[in-house]
Swiss-Prot record:
Belongs to the ribose 5-phosphate isomerase family. The active site is at residue 105. Substrate binds at residues 30-33, 83-86, 96-99, 123. It comes from the Bacteria. The keyword Transport does not apply. InterPro entries: NagB/RpiA_transferase-like, Ribose5P_isomerase_typA_subgr, Ribose5P_isomerase_type_A. Pfam families: Rib_5-P_isom_A. GO terms for biological process: D-ribose metabolic process; pentose-phosphate shunt, non-oxidative branch. This is Ribose-5-phosphate isomerase A. The lineage of its organism: Bacteria, Pseudomonadati, Pseudomonadota, Gammaproteobacteria, Alteromonadales. SUPFAM superfamilies: D-ribose-5-phosphate isomerase (RpiA), lid domain (SSF75445), NagB/RpiA/CoA transferase-like (SSF100950). It catalyses: aldehydo-D-ribose 5-phosphate = D-ribulose 5-phosphate. Catalyzes the reversible conversion of ribose-5-phosphate to ribulose 5-phosphate. Keywords: Isomerase.
């Protein structure tokens, strides 16, 4: 089963290569599907200027392939950002951050002109919320943020033993009834001590490449 899942992830990741423009800096996300994208990108490393990366793990993989990794502050434009999702709807709204890289992912997504999500069909959902919503918090605010999240109807669980690349902690929030993703995303971000959360609703995917048994489906959300 895992071999088949990997084949679907690889198919979705390789389909994203059609959107890569020569001579540009490519935004690169984090996760198992993105790892396949990085491997495919290596075959065109001489065509691109380099990449900006959303995690130390992706940076390490990019560099191992000889792809130059730039600091985001030194880059003027990121034409495309390729990343996976833990859940995605037909509207391109997502839950992301199961791997803990949500803040840097959200920053690069905000900068990028186009967001291409690569995923297998198991990630497509009618409504977000089955997968816990990760919330990155400043460590000293963990208990306070957790209490505020309970008031919003969520059940926060501290991801003990995990520290983000930014030196912060993660609360995985279960049992959210997500009827209005953009509203909940804003409410979570308004809690003092929250860095950001894994709802990508205000800035979702422009294109979703969903790998199924019979091929890769292209879902154009906007643009």
């Amino acid at each position: 089963m895992s071999g088949n899942a990997d084949a679907l992830k690889k198919a979705a990741a390789e389909a994203a290569m059609q959107y890569i423009e020569d001579g540009t800096v490519v935004g690169v996300g984090t996760g198992s599907t993105v790892n396949f994208f990085i491997d495919a990108l290596a075959e065109r490393k001489h065509d691109i200027e380099g990449a900006v990366s959303s995690s130390e793990a992706s940076t390490e993989r990019l560099k191992s392939h000889g792809i130059e990794v730039f600091e985001l502050n030194s880059v003027v434009e990121v034409p495309i950002y390729v990343d996976g999702a833990d859940e995605i709807t037909e509207h391109g709204q997502m839950v992301k951050g199961g791997g803990g890289a949500l803040t840097r992912e959200k920053i690069i997504a905000a900068v990028a002109r186009k967001f291409v999500c690569v995923a297998d069909e198991s990630k497509m959902v009618g409504r977000l919320g089955q997968f816990p919503v990760p919330v990155e918090v400043i460590p000293m605010a963990r208990s306070y943020v957790a209490r505020e999240i309970v008031k919003l109807g969520g059940d926060p669980v501290w991801r003990q033993g995990f520290t983000t690349d930014n030196g912060n902690w993660i609360l995985d929030v279960h049992n959210f009834d997500i009827m209005e993703p953009m509203k909940l995303e804003a409410e979570l971000n308004n809690i003092v001590g929250v860095v950001t959360n894994g709802l990508f609703a205000q800035r979702g995917a422009d294109i979703a490449l969903i790998a199924r048994e019979d091929g890769v489906q292209t879902l154009k959300v906007s643009g």
